Amino acid sequence: MKSLFLSLAAMAMFVAAPVLAQEQAIGEKAPMITAPLMGIDGKANTLLDLKGDNGLLVIFSCNTCPFVVGNAHKTEGWEGRYNGLAELAESLNIGMVLVNSNEAKREGDDSLPAMKSHAMEAGYTMPYVVDEGSKLANACGARTTPHVYLYNSNLELAYRGAIDDNVNRAEEVKERYLDMAMRRLAEGKKIKTTETKAVGCSIKRVR
């Protein structure tokens, strides 16, 4: 009886698990490029709308994860580097968008009003949109906040992973993976490091 219960429990967990694709491979086209994504400004845009001449930077993010917003004296988080990335992206004619896929927290910390409030407090200078049902995250295979997806002018994946190698302090960063990838992408050069491990909180999907 015990083994039967465990088997049924395991089956239930399997059935309840969200549909999550493998992480996109380098060179693959961005998914859902014409799907409307509601922003904190009340306007819906698509990835195609947000793309710049040289590509599009998509960062899956949220309002509460310590890897994003920091945690007292332990880590400053990556959020403080978002606006600098936005400035760089604009100078390189690369579009940028933050995507909130935390559907399981949509009635609380990651609601649209909470996103708007957080963006104002943090001083975001880039679009911040809702990924309803975590559909875009599922299609990309995004797993964490933050999780970076950089696409070229044809919306083909050029870099995927982390922003850099130090979430704790920006001044201690040794490898600026995303910065370098964006610059080389805009210059038409081959990106040396196309994949790194994304480190962060799990995206809160509905189960």
Q: PLM features: what roles do these ranges have?
A:
Residues 7-16:
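Bacterial N-terminal signal peptides
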Residues 20-48, 77:
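N-terminal "domain-start" segment that seeds a small globular fold
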Residues 68-121, 132-138:
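Structural microenvironment flanking redox-active thiols in thiol-disulfide oxidoreductases
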Residues 46-75, 182:
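Short active-site neighborhood of thiol/selenol oxidoreductases, capturing the structured segment around
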Residues 150-207:
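Thiol-/selenol-based redox modules, centered on thioredoxin-like
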Residues 52-56, 90-96, 123-127, 145, ...:
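Loop/turn elements at helix/coil->beta-strand transitions in domains of secreted/extracellular proteins
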Residues 115-152, 158:
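Short, internal strand/loop/helix patches
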Residues 1-5:
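Positively charged n-region of N-terminal signal peptides that target proteins for export
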